Amino acid sequence: GNYTERQFADALRKGIRADGQRLYPAMPYVSYAAMTDADVHALYAYFMQGVPAVEQAAPPTELPFPMNVRASMKLWNALFLDEQPLPPAPDRSPQWLRGRYLAEGAAHCGTCHTPRGFLMQEKKELNMSGAQVGPWYAPNITPHATGIGAWSETELVQYLRTGRLEGKAQAAGSM
């Protein structure tokens, strides 16, 4: 509740806390970097005016060396954080563009469904092709036959609304 809207936007899209410390990419700011100013403003307004304030100290971050060195996140961000908006795709429909924005930005689907590299960066060339997330497997959600390519629009809508699709999928883990 003590963040200004600018500080909130920087945390959300750049991974920088109000005190200037770097966030770890467990906070999916790499995906949120694609969010529009209007959506960031709407989130800020909701959190500040629509969610009751709770005094709760965050537990200390406990990571092994060298991941526990927050200053290293500056280098990680220089290598892997793209602060540019999603590239234009003038040949695509408004529905496709909105879907890309939701999947790659606000909903951050790739955060779990994209394999990670040695430095825990998303392997963009394998975007949304499925990945291990702790004890869970986030499956391939590309249009490939091994993903959701054979699903109908109705099935996809049902799954996103309910988290299950009889005979095909059941949401689990952090989904």
Regions inferred by a protein language model and the residue ranges of each:
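Electron-transfer interface patches adjacent to heme c in soluble/periplasmic c-type cytochromes
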Residues: 1-9, 30-38, 126-165
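Extended intrinsically disordered, low-complexity coil regions enriched in Ser, Thr, Gly, Ala
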Residues: 4-7, 17-24, 116-121, 152-155, ...
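The canonical Cys-X-X-Cys-His
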Residues: 8, 43, 102, 106-116
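Detector for the c-type heme attachment site
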Residues: 13-16, 48-49, 112-118, 161, ...
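Hydrophobic or amphipathic alpha-helical targeting/insertion segments
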Residues: 40-47
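Extended, well-folded interaction surfaces typified by the phenylalanyl-tRNA synthetase beta subunit core
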Residues: 55-71
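Electrostatic cytochrome c docking/interface patches
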Residues: 75-104, 145, 150
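Extended amphipathic alpha-helical interaction segments
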Residues: 84-88, 101, 111-121
